[in-house]
């Protein structure tokens, strides 16, 4: 289902549909041992997260840094347990006010109704600009490459 969404969780539910088990909490969308990869992450940002707890810690650090107005699901390409989808978001850096208008390609693998692997492709230059540059962004993010 393409269209606009208020939250990233709603966008995931729209993109993955009935492949996802119904859940109450956003983090329950992800398997306990989820692998989250950011192939284009800039220096100082994690390139890989291992496990739901690591994802939760990452989101706790990242959440206050960016403000989102909306998410728009553009296209969805399902293929068995893997779904590729393209989406965009409109927002800004919380401290800088700089635009965070990002486009993503996500490759998601599901297992037993949960996200087991998520590869997130996005433009790091847009993120760095929104956060105030490389040094500021790395300091804000914490700079840990792998959490587990």
Feature annotation, model-predicted:
Residues 1-33, 146-148:
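Short acidic-aromatic low-complexity motifs
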Residues 3, 7, 19-25, 50, ...:
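Serine/threonine-rich low-complexity intrinsically disordered regions
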Residues 5, 23-80:
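A solvent-exposed, acidic/Ser-Thr-rich amphipathic alpha-helical stretch
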Residues 10-11, 19, 40-43, 93:
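Residue-level detector of alpha-helix boundaries and kinks
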């Amino acid at each position: 289902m393409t269209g606009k969404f208020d939250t990233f969780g709603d966008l995931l539910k729209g993109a993955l549909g009935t492949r996802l088990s119904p859940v109450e909490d956003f983090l329950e969308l992800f398997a306990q041992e989820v692998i989250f990869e950011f192939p284009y992450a800039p220096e100082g940002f994690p390139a890989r997260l291992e496990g739901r707890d690591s994802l939760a810690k990452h989101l706790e650090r990242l959440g206050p840094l960016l403000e989102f107005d909306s998410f728009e699901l553009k296209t969805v390409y399902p293929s068995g347990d893997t779904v590729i989808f393209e989406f965009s978001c409109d927002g800004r850096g919380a401290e800088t006010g700089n635009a965070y208008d990002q486009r993503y390609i996500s490759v998601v693998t599901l297992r037993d109704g949960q996200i087991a692997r998520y590869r997130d492709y996005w433009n790091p230059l847009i993120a760095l600009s929104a956060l105030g540059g490389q040094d500021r962004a790395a300091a804000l993010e914490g700079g840990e490459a792998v959490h587990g």
